[in-house]
Amino acid sequence: MRVPSLSVLSFLLGTALAAASNFEAGLLSSGKVSLGDWKSAHEKASQFVAKLNTTEKIKLITGSSVTTTNGETFTALDILDGDMGAQAYYYVSAFSLSSALAMTWDKEAMYEQGRAIAAEFYGKGIQMVAGPTSQPLGRTPWGGRLVESFGPDPYLNGIATGLETRAYADVGVIAGAKHFILNEQETNRTGGMGGGGGAPGGGGMGRGAEFSSSVPGGMSPTSSAGAIPSSTSTPGGSGMGGGMAGSSAFSSSSSSGAPYSSNADDKTLHETYLWSFYDAVHSGLGGVMCAMTKVNGTLSCQSSSLLLDILKTELGFPGMVWPDTNGQQDALASAANGLDYGSSSLWSESTIEGYLESNNITEARLNDMAIRNLMGYYYVNLDNGTQPSTAAQDDYVDVRANHAKLIRSHGSKSMVLLKNKNNTLPLYKPHKMAIFGSHARAAVAGPNMQFSVEGSGPTYDGHIATDSGSGQASLPYLITPENALNIKASQDGTMLRWIANDTYSSSTGSALVMQGSSSTSVTPSVSAYSENMDVCLVFINALAGEGADRTELRNTDQDNLINEVADNCDNTVVVINTVGARILDSWIEHENVTAVLYGSLLGQESGNSIVDVLYGDVNPSGRLTYTIAKTESDYNVDICYTAQCNFTEGNYIDYRYFDAYNVTPRYEFGYGLSYTDFAYSNLHIQGPSALSTYPTGQLAVGGYEDLWDTVAKVTVTIRNAGSLDGAEVPQLYISYPDVAKQPVRQLRGFHNVYIKKGQSTKVTFELRRRDISYWDVQHQKWAVAPGTYEAWVGASSRDLRTHGSFVVKTKA
């Protein structure tokens, strides 16, 4: 199949400010969006704002506490990173990163972790999480922050984002999803060749910005979001306009900055990058962080098209939009075009009052901004007065409960078994074991250590269990593999040796000293330590994070270590924890590399989670959330080093690209082995009756209501045909009729089901209307194509075990 090429888009920044026709766009008071269960929150917020004067409204939208004329007080929200735990706090848990959670493919785990994180935020008196982190999605595997998000597949990412959003709201904490939108790399995100970031774009914005651990008190802007000016290649041109105050010539009420522009067409924007934000809004999202970067030439936080037309109208988003660091650069452009919370240095009282007097913004717009700042607060019932007061970072307020058990369990569920030759794993009481690699042990300082990612090496000298920047958890302690393996060895009577470094030579001054009798002394070298072992474990990692993109997808020192161990040990097991895709081909086919266990960053219980899988206390059920290629050149998108980053690949990223161009991966999206075997049978499809081409329901929070209706069901029977109990992850892939112009196959359902040996279970996938819709650019609507839809169910995107089809007839 040949992917239709997408022309490189050219864009113009709009210069007209405050067009009168846009004054009503995106206003909650317009009644265009049915608020559903947000109605009560809107009534309360509107009543509160009605009691404020202009000065008080301006204080509210710039992060200050306000008191009404009759004495009602709203205390400014505390916003904090992130979706791996309360950053920079004591007596909190360090959860696995979002990328690890996604690798569980377990909806219950996704919701459980969201509830646990929210409970800790709530207990610390923090009202809003700067999360979930839906994007960067994963356009390129070199992206520096992919470890923070749920992966490049829109459906999987959307399910995880929605479940975490719902979990936060159910506990009573506001979810603030980021980064909106097309913020797919760190390079040039602030206009320089480096990643930059860290400092708020203006004053008066308390805690909440990216790198919030270095920002004292209050509330500040955090993650990224995007905006889209008009594209000459977009049919009809609608839905892609740059908006009112889109000028790059900043006024005196501007802050400087020139980040890259992500240039994507309307179809790509909707079908790949907006998908997960639909899930979040539908699930109770109270905040959206707009990115510091541009989309189609306009700053994301200053685009009426993105914020007013798409987010607040098309998606029906009822909450507030706040900026990532440096995302707000022009006072009027941001105020007029959809930003709701901003910097007091730009939105001063005199500035906003001047805009009102000159009719550059209306009173209705100011009221809407103020109301949206309160919507999430009332929606999650923070007004009930039961939340504890805000704790200082080092106060002894222990909110961890039994979360360590959950973290350990989710970590082990996320580990992916890539290779298991001759059933090497699980291990059973080996007599002699050797451990290699710095990733097996703790770093020399820790468990929390501030360091700069930009300019640092691509690996971490120690066991890496959390990220840096906004993705860094506050580790109360860290269980390393070395810790957990020593405990196992003491229980099993295993003899251990280790070289806890990635490089080693037996030169003078070596830390390895020959001592003991001739029966126990060993020449201090990797080859000597790996000889005559029952099993050799090699631990490797990869480092990346906010502020810089990855410089390599493999590491020479680590690969040399693996090959040297495998040359001397006929049972070499490699354990990898990485921030993204890792090329394995320099050693994966080595005959002595018998097993490979692969995962993301697992939090405080990391070593226990890994060892639980190595020894079979947990049967692995993790699955890849991205494609591992055979070589770097097999990926189709690199980091963009220019000011204009054109998304000419369209929807074809990760497995959708590999499938379209018949590129054979090393390990495909959705791949993962188990210690047992599963068989698939009895596929049955209950197809839809005739469907309207376009949605006919009411425009509501999360888009048109009937987008979420179940229109078809696919059922399959799965049998555990092996000798061990275990969990399988059946995956549903759909192909569309040609008129929809879609990838070869797309994920449209998954489950993680535990099945005892010899038993069977029936699994049902429910297809929603949106799951079989495509974006009709001409009509600016989600459309269902008439014709035959193919359905495959299998164990990965390429291991498809059973197949069927259904026909959809459409009506006007």
Curated annotation (Swiss-Prot):
N-terminal signal peptide: 1-18
Keyword Hydrolase found: yes
Subcellular location: Secreted
GO process annotations (BP): cellulose catabolic process; glucan catabolic process; secondary metabolic process
Keywords assigned: Carbohydrate metabolism, Cellulose degradation, Glycoprotein, Glycosidase, Hydrolase, Polysaccharide degradation, Secreted, Signal
Gene Ontology cellular component terms for the protein in this record: extracellular region
UniProt enzyme class: hydrolase
Pathway listed: Glycan metabolism; cellulose degradation
Catalyzed reactions per annotation: Hydrolysis of terminal, non-reducing beta-D-glucosyl residues with release of beta-D-glucose
Main location: secreted
EC number annotated for this UniProt entry: 3.2.1.21
Listed GO MF terms: beta-glucosidase activity
Annotated SMART domains: Fn3_like
Region feature (Disordered): 186-248
Glycosylated residues, chain numbering: 53, 188, 296, 360, 384, 422, 501, 592, 646
Superkingdom, natural source: Eukaryota
Keyword Membrane found: no
Active-site feature positions: 324
Record field: compositional bias (Gly residues): 191-207, 236-245
Biased composition (Polar residues): 211-225
Function: Beta-glucosidases are one of a number of cellulolytic enzymes involved in the degradation of cellulosic biomass. Catalyzes the last step releasing glucose from the inhibitory cellobiose.
Family according to the record: Belongs to the glycosyl hydrolase 3 family.
Entries under PANTHER family matching the protein: BETA-GLUCOSIDASE, BETA-GLUCOSIDASE D-RELATED
Record-given protein name: Probable beta-glucosidase D
